[in-house]
Each structure stands twice: as structure tokens, then as C-alpha cells.
């Protein structure tokens, strides 16, 4: 009964998702209209439609951009959830097609949805496109253009810099960041950086140099913020998808299967052996405590009753473990799909993150690089790494409810660390040796 109530409440919550999302988008559109009516004579929020100062205009533009972002997000949720519900409820719609009351309610709901969507479109049509997405795209294009052609921003007059950068971003549809690993030449990179720094400091055009420093700082700050945000999204979204799908969808389905097949208790032989060993240990503990006087001496009937009660608890515990293990398999699959979708739809952000990580890793001192390489190799491919890999494999098997396979574990430990060590050595020889030869020399000395 409790399971049915939970499934019904969850189903009702999913069914009302499109309505909730549309209402939130509608309220955000009302907020934008309220700002336009009160402060901009019912027109678009811009400098041309009001006599406020720059700070006030910026404040209202930020508010509108925030509401536009909410509207776009809620409309995306509305479309996706409505499509999913329309596919899942197709049969119910066909069965109730002839009911006049149901048909009338559907028509009324459709009219309400149409009116709200029409109002939302009228509000956001004034702003042509999402201001926040446009700002992000422009910033990414500026970073990419300046990384590819530094002379675009360095040599142009201050009044024409933004125009040239923007034109460069329009001409190039794909953004290719020049990572630190690609900046190689005849002279060492540190030597060239020092010369460039001295040249900039003695440049008589000090005003232009200061502007370049500010531009570089803004670009670096934006790149750092975008990279951290994207990395957090890569972590949070799969975890959130995992918990939501497992809690509200997978576990109820698997529990329903186990309730129909009560004879299924253990999903593999290892779990059964663990349960029997635990039950046997409990029975022996009762005998032992009675013999040494730590507990009352129990009769065989009483011991059997206690063991029977413990067997019921163990059965419930291992059934729950089996349910969680099966749910983990599909929840991890959904998480992986969400992770891949985020990567596929974030190509620009990936370019920014790659450039950000390259600057951090290749900007470390030579001893720091050597220390991190030695730490990584000793941890994953060193002498003591087989014990760590064995613990990881046992944890993965327990997570998915798989029986432990010693032969597979030994085969994995004998091959995967070797492959990892080969890839690392190739990276040191192919890339690090060209970019930072002193770091490679330091690594060899520390490793010896």
C-alpha cells in the first residue's frame, strides 16, 4: 500500500511538471513586463526608453537577463517533460477520446497554455535573443580570437579592438584554443616569456600596456569562472541524475519485481555465502555467551527462535542490497548518458577548460611537475599499486552486486597499470620533453 502511494505521488509530481515549469516562466515574463511598465513606459528595457543613469540601466538589464534565463530554462523543461508525458500517456488519451468531459478539460487547458506561451513570446521577442547566452558566446569568441591572434588585440587602436576581435570571431565558426602544449619553438618558452615581459615594461606606450593588462586580467577571470562552473556542472549533473533516477524510478520498479518474486533473495552466490556465514556466527555467539555467563543460557527452542528472527533480518538486509545493486547499474548508465550529453553540448566550454588546465599544469614550476608525475605514477603504477587496484575492483563489484572474480582482478592488475605507465611515458617523451626539458630532467633525478 505504501509503495502504491509513493508511486502515485511520484507519478502526479511528474505529470504536473510541464504546468509548474510553464507557470514559473509565465511569472518571470510578468516580472519583465512589470519592470517595463513601471520604469520604461512599457517599452523594452534599454537606455533609449528611459532617462536613468548608467548604473540604474545596468541594474535593470541584469534583472531582465536573469528573468530571460529563467524563462528559457523553464521552457526547456516544459517542452521536454510535455513531450515525455505525451508519449507515455498516448494510450490513455486514445481511450478517453470519446469522453466529452475529458475533451472539454483538454481544450480548456490547451487554451490556457496557448495564452501563456503567447504572452511569453511577446515579452521575450523584444530582446531578440537570450542576453546571457549571447554574452557567453561573445566572451568565448573573444578568448579564442585573442588566443589565436594576439596581434588583433595588441596592435589595434583602442577604439577598434572590439570590432576586430568580433569580426575575427564571426569569420571563424570553430574555436580552437592554442594550449600551452602547442606553444613550442626553438628557444625555451620561459626565456621568450621573460623577453616579452621586459619588452612590455619598457614600452613607451604605457597607456596601451595598462589596457592590455586589464584586458588580459578580465579574460583570465572570465576563463577561470567559466572553467570552474563547467567542471562543477560535470560533477553535479551526473550525481543529481543518478540520485533522482535511482530514488524515484529505479528502486520502486526493482522493489516491485522483488515483491512479485519472493523466492529471489540473493543476486549472486557470494552474497548468499556472506549471509550464511553471518547467521552461523550469530548462532555461535548465542551459544558462547550462554556458556561463559555473559547472557542467559538459552534452550534449543529459544536459540532457534532467535536465529529465525535474525535470519529474517538478514534476508531483508540482503534483499535491500540486491535492489540497490541492480538500481545502481541503470542509475550509473543514466549518469553516464547525462555526462556525455553535457560534453556534446558544451564544445566551447571544453575549449576554455582545456586552455585553463593547460595554463595551470604547464605553468607549474619544474619541481612541482616532477613531484606530481612521481606521485601519480607511484600511486597508480608503482610497486604498491596492485593493492590499491584490488580494493578499487572489489568496491566496484560490491557497488554493482557482482561476484568477486579473482582471475579477472589479477588479469586487470597485470595489464591496465602497464598500459597506463606506457601512456604516461609517451606523454613525457612526446610533449613534456619539448615544452619543459628541465622538468623531465628534474623528474629523472628525483626518480633515481
UniProtKB/Swiss-Prot annotation:
Species, as recorded: Rippkaea orientalis (strain PCC 8801 / RF-1)
InterPro entries, alphabetized: CemA (IPR004282)
Entry's family note: Belongs to the CemA family.
Presence of the UniProt keyword Transport in the record: yes
Cysteine-cysteine disulfides: none
Membrane topology: Multi-pass membrane protein
Main location: membrane
Pfam families assigned to the protein according to its UniProt record, in alphabetical order: CemA
Entry GO MF terms: proton transmembrane transporter activity
Gene Ontology CC terms, in alphabetical order: plasma membrane
Entry protein name: Proton extrusion protein PxcA
Function: Required for H(+) efflux immediately after light irradiation to form a rapid H(+) concentration gradient across the thylakoid membranes. Together with PxcL, contributes to transient H(+) uptake following dark to light transition.
